[in-house]
Amino acid sequence: MLYNPLEQFTVNKIISLYTVYYSMSLTNSSLYFIIAAIISFFIFKYSANIPYVSLINKNNYSILTESLYKTILKMVKEQIGDKYTIYMPLIFSLFIIILVSNLVGLIPYGFSPTALFALPLGLSVTIIISVTVIGFVKYHLKYFSVLLPSGTPLGLVPLLLVVELLSYIARAFSLGIRLAANITSGHILLNIISGFLFKTSGIALLFVIIPFTLFIALTGLELIVAILQAYVWSILTCIYIKDSLILH
């Protein structure tokens, strides 16, 4: 039992390999991310065949996968427009890998890779750099007009330029911090409640029922948060891509 709520986020080495020139380790965070990647691979593999799945052969898994695929497809179409086919594989991949990474952390003694700020921040910075490159390749220097709204008075140009630049850079951090903070806070709360349940297991039944009910409710809430955060990440990525394709 973990008595320190933050102990669950400790990165521990499972296997270490040392050579003369470098060292390589498999940590618990890496292991669970590999598990999430393997699960995501099978979801991708099945999703690729969705248009060819027979109505007769459908089961609960196929219905769930198809629902996820069509939900993301609809969102990408609405946000990006005519060029949605180019970016649909990227957005769906991000949605699934983040969703599965969030969910594996709900397994008892599991580890959520997205609870570590390094992974979400690395992904978010990569996304912002990529959409900036997309916009720069399409519009060249004109792309930087996104930092200066049209009709801005000349006297406000320096101030607005700094504000818009900071706002643009903040996207790279807010996207990752939002995900990591939500997953981390939920796991900490669940750990505190489960620790309280463990300590009160020998007391009167009334003192166990209330925390246990709260624990079940919070677990359900965490499940919803895991799905919503993956969806929010996907829709924000679509918005950033759209902004790089269409200058306002």
UniProtKB/Swiss-Prot annotation:
Q: Where is it found, in Gene Ontology cellular component terms?
A: mitochondrial inner membrane; proton-transporting ATP synthase complex
> Which residues make up the pro-peptide?
1-3
A GO molecular function term, named singly, is: proton-transporting ATP synthase activity, rotational mechanism
Q: Which UniProt keywords apply?
A: ATP synthesis, CF(0), Hydrogen ion transport, Ion transport, Membrane, Mitochondrion, Mitochondrion inner membrane, Transmembrane, Transmembrane helix, Transport
PROSITE patterns attached to this UniProt entry: ATPASE_A
A Pfam short name: ATP-synt_A
| Principal location | mitochondrion
Looking up CDD domains in the UniProt record yields:
ATP-synt_Fo_a_6 (cd00310)
The membrane spanning regions, by residue number, are: 24-44, 86-106, 117-137, 146-166, 183-203, 205-225, 227-247
Top-rank taxon of the source lineage equals Eukaryota
Q: Topology relative to the membrane, per the entry?
A: Multi-pass membrane protein
Under InterPro entries, the record lists: ATP_synth_F0_asu, ATP_synth_F0_asu_AS, ATP_synth_F0_asu_bact/mt, F0_ATP_A_sf
Q: Where in the cell is it found?
A: Mitochondrion inner membrane
Q: Which PANTHER family match?
A: ATP SYNTHASE SUBUNIT A
Q: Which family does it belong to?
A: Belongs to the ATPase A chain family.
Task: Relate the assembly described in the record.
Answer: F-type ATPases have 2 components, CF(1) - the catalytic core - and CF(0) - the membrane proton channel. CF(1) has five subunits: alpha(3), beta(3), gamma(1), delta(1), epsilon(1). CF(0) has three main subunits: a, b and c.
User: What this chain does, per the record?
Assistant: Mitochondrial membrane ATP synthase (F(1)F(0) ATP synthase or Complex V) produces ATP from ADP in the presence of a proton gradient across the membrane which is generated by electron transport complexes of the respiratory chain. F-type ATPases consist of two structural domains, F(1) - containing the extramembraneous catalytic core and F(0) - containing the membrane proton channel, linked together by a central stalk and a peripheral stalk. During catalysis, ATP synthesis in the catalytic domain of F(1) is coupled via a rotary mechanism of the central stalk subunits to proton translocation.
Q: What name appears for this protein in its UniProt entry?
A: ATP synthase subunit a
Its source organism is Zancudomyces culisetae
Gene from which the chain derives: atp6
